[in-house]
Amino acid sequence: MTFKITTLFFLLAVSISFSQENLTYQKPPKSILDLADYQRAPSVSMDTKKVYMLLSYRNTYKTLDDLNQDELRLGGLRINPITNISSSVTYINNLKLRKIDGKDEIQITGLPENPKIANLQWSPNETKIAFTHTTQKGVQLYVIDVATAVASRLLNDNLNANLGSPFSWYPNNSQLLVKLLPTNKARLIDPKKDLPTGPIVSNASGTKSQNRTYPDMLKNKSDETNFENIITSELHTYSLNGTAALFKAADMYAGQSFSPDGNLVMITTIQKPFSYIVPLSRFPSTAIVYNLNAIAIKTVNQTPLTEIMPKGFMAVAKGKRNMSWRTDVASTLVFTEALDAGDPATKVDFRDEIFLWKAPFVENPTSLLKTPQRFGGIT
């Protein structure tokens, strides 16, 4: 009797295991599927003249392939080390144009097969739209001609989209400043195969500070090397006619922005030392203004590593912050400085002061206004 029962359980177990070998993902009944598997409404982007609308369509959910991609988490970034773009980006799968005063949607032709579109950016005169397309190997650059609704590829899959926008339009509307992977890009260190060369050492300054815990921080020297690797780019100028030229050699570029008159460009780079307790937004950085021949005009900001901050949601770092070009004049920077040393517990009449700094930056910045509370922005 015992033998028969044991045999029966064995046969049942074998039957269950065999029945599960070829199990695949199943679809729910149609009534449930209709509720869950719906088509998302497109996102809308309009030109400032209110002539065209760009309709961006996305999948309702990420695919299993999207969720199964490699991911590297360093310095607060989550990137795909194969394609060199954020692993959390939600891609656009189709683009259409529509005139504001019309009803017909115009399908944009020339889009890549199985589009994975991101980083949409209108040209300054709004006659072109640039975007990236992610392939299995990397990130490509496309440009749409709005008048004809035709997209064409400008660059193959070697853009670096790991940090910030991978490209910026020149104000002349015929060129783009593009971040490319370095020609001599080093391989990433595999922590499972490459042994560390020494211990991890942390030094305490003796200063009290209440820091929140951030995810995806750097943990060791291998992480530091890999972090520097993934954010290092070369800056190249690409014309819509296909010509190209190196603008700046490889560096850890965090951002680039042109002055409204198109004669200057402010380029921000990440500096060392890195930190194991705060993300890259608080790493040291340097902002330098260049002319269009890549000659440095002025170092306009140097931000130190900021691991210690005052308590409170209104706490900010000391020094210049939120530096950008004033959009209604030729080449003037606008930035903010805290008047309370960044500490909201300090009692002051004014928290922030906003400054204007006119190129070529030989004179001191001039005060625009002071705010009793923390400055948020000007429109």
Where are these regions (language model features)?
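Bacterial Sec-dependent N-terminal signal peptides
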Residues: M1-L23
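Beta-propeller folds
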Residues: S19-T379
